[in-house]
Amino acid sequence: MEWKIESLPVPYDKAMCFMQQRVEGIANKTQDELVWLLEHFPLYTAGTSARSEELLTDSLFPVYSTGRGGKYTYHGPGQRIAYVMMDLKARDKCNVRLYVETLGEWIVKTLKHFSIRSYFNPNLIGVWVNHNGSEKKIAAFGIRIRKWITYHGVSINVFTDLSHYSGIIPCGIKEYGITSLKTLGVNILYEEFDVVLKKEFNKVFCNC
């Protein structure tokens, strides 16, 4: 598994092209699987289940339609994105459901390292925390699979400007809010977070 970490924001359309090409390379066995850590410039994306009324304004940031599962979400500075391109065929026990659950376990264990108690909710796909008596999402999931190879992935709010979510109903869920590591009192940079992400990934995906 190769790891690629970007130091500058990656334009969304370029990231999509890169992932599609990488999936083909993995399928053809000419390129290795990849975990790609990056951030985007501020934007909204609409998954395959997004409804027009969940986009409250299109004047804040660019809006991209994407083939991943899910509804509307936000990407931008302070949010660590992990795009995982993995060949499920190469893992006898790893079906789609187990893959998504293992992604959840990965993020939960990463956050635990920073003393954040969280949980993966399979019904409201994502990783959640209980903050001041209310449930809030700290990590969103959006997955696509082609030729049994995964792409897209997970976005974790590290020091995200949460006001940027105001233009959408995040993931189509009105009842619950959004939070970040910074809001929870954990002030870290990507470099520290990435080290833990890689360490925990290698642990949880050893059985997938």
Curated annotation (Swiss-Prot):
Function: Catalyzes the transfer of endogenously produced octanoic acid from octanoyl-acyl-carrier-protein onto the lipoyl domains of lipoate-dependent enzymes. Lipoyl-ACP can also act as a substrate although octanoyl-ACP is likely to be the physiological substrate.
GO biological-process terms attached to the record: protein modification process
Residue span(s) of domain BPL/LPL catalytic: 29-208
UniProt-annotated location(s): Cytoplasm
Keyword presence, S-adenosyl-L-methionine: no
The protein's name: Octanoyltransferase
Family: Belongs to the LipB family.
Pathway: Protein modification; protein lipoylation via endogenous pathway; protein N(6)-(lipoyl)lysine from octanoyl-[acyl-carrier-protein]: step 1/2
Catalytic center residues: C171 (acyl-thioester intermediate)
Pfam families: LplA-B_cat
Primary residence: cytoplasm
HAMAP family xrefs: LipB (MF_00013)
Reaction equation(s) it catalyzes: octanoyl-[ACP] + L-lysyl-[protein] = N(6)-octanoyl-L-lysyl-[protein] + holo-[ACP] + H(+)
GO terms under cellular component: cytoplasm
SUPFAM superfamilies on file: Class II aaRS and biotin synthetases
Protein's UniProt keywords contain Membrane: no
Note: In the reaction, the free carboxyl group of octanoic acid is attached via an amide linkage to the epsilon-amino group of a specific lysine residue of lipoyl domains of lipoate-dependent enzymes.
Coiled-coil ranges per UniProt: none
InterPro entries xref list: aa-tRNA-synth_II/BPL/LPL (IPR045864), BPL_LPL_catalytic (IPR004143), Octanoyltransferase (IPR000544), Octanoyltransferase_CS (IPR020605)
Residues holding substrate: R68, G69, G70, K71, Y72, T73, Y74, H75, A140, F141, G142, G153, V154, S155
